Amino acid sequence: DIKHANRLGCTVIRVIVNTPPEIMAKAAPYAEQYNVRLGLEIHAPFNFEHEWIQRHLDTVYKVDRPYLGIVPDMGIFEKRFPRVRSNRYIRRGAHPLIVQYISEVYARHEGFDRLLEDVKKMRANELDLAMANDIQHMTYVTPRRLLDYMPIIFHIHAKFNEMLED
C-alpha cells in the first residue's frame, strides 16, 4: 500500500484503528523511504484517552519519525446526536419521545451505562433499541484536544451530518 500510494502521488495513508502499533513501527522506515506518512485514524468509539490509542501514541513518540502520526475522525467531536439521524429513526418508526430521551442522554455525555436498560423500560421497539445501541459507539471529545496533538496530525477524516452555528 505504501509503494502504491507513493506511485499515485499520495503522501498520507489513513491507517485503520485495528492495526497493531508494532506494525506501524515496523512500517515507519518503509514509509519514510517512499515519502508516505502513516496516520492512525482515531475513530469513535475510540478517543485520545483509550488504552489502544494510547499504545499507538506511545509508539509514535517512541519511534520519533516524522512518518508516523494520527488522522482524527471528526466524529469524535459530535457534541449532540445529529438531528438528521434522529429524524431518520423517527421516520422509520422509532418513538419520538424515546428518540428525544436518547438524544438528551447523549447531549449530557453521561448515563450511557444505563441507557439500554432505561429505554427497554420505556416499551421500546426495535428502532428505539437500535438508536440506543448506536450512541454506544459514539464519543465526544472537546475539539481543544486537537491542540495537544497538532505536531502529529497528518490529516483529518470527516463527514458532516449537519452543521449548526455553535
Language-model features: locations:
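Glycoside hydrolase catalytic-domain groove-lining segments
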Residues: 83-166
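Active-site acidic/histidine proton-transfer and metal-coordination neighborhood
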Residues: 1-119
